Amino acid sequence: GDLPVYLHEAEQRFCSDPMLNLSGLMGMQVTCREPDHWLKGGEELVLGAHAFRVVHAPGHSPGCVLFIHDASSQALVGDTLFAGSIGRIDFPTSDPEKMRHTLEKVMMALPDELAIHPGHGPATTIGDERRSNPFIRGGF
């Protein structure tokens, strides 16, 4: 069967609007079905024996979320934070001020030893990014 789809409620219109989901800007008209579950942030998502804390992390897009697996000190962070960089904030639905808040108040409140797995690129840790990421150290 189909896998269940989860999406943050701030991106509710992205499913049906190619300009909001940015496919329209790339010459495509991609739409998708509504998700099976809407996220708000603050939930616990259980997959098999693994529990993930869902944290709302807007900036790159209004509905970015982190999936934090506290038991293993790892997190899936999408395009919020990369090794040495951050997610783009020049898209029409991005918000630089919300990204700044997410990085300063959400990401940097996480423990240094937390391994983060971005949407693409190598894994890193919060501590490594706190020490060396120019967007964390110097802002943007």
Which ranges hold each PLM region?
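Active-site HxH/HxHxD metal-binding segment of metal-dependent hydrolases
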Residues: G1-V46, H50, R131-G138
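Catalytic core of the metallo-beta-lactamase
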Residues: V30-A109, T125, R137-G138
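Phosphate-coordinating loops and pocket residues in cytosolic domains that bind phosphorylated ligands
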Residues: D17, H101, D128
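A structural signal for short coil/turn segments at secondary-structure junctions
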Residues: G1, L110-P111
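Short, active-site-adjacent cap segments at secondary-structure transitions
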Residues: R13-F14, A123-G127
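Divalent metal-binding pocket/active-site signature
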Residues: R13, I68, H120
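Active-site neighborhood of phospho(di)ester-bond hydrolases with catalytic His/Asp-centered motifs
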Residues: V5-H8, V54-G59, L76-G78, A115-H120
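Charged phosphate-binding loop/patch that engages nucleotide di/tri-phosphates or the phosphate backbone
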Residues: D112-I116, G127-D128, I136
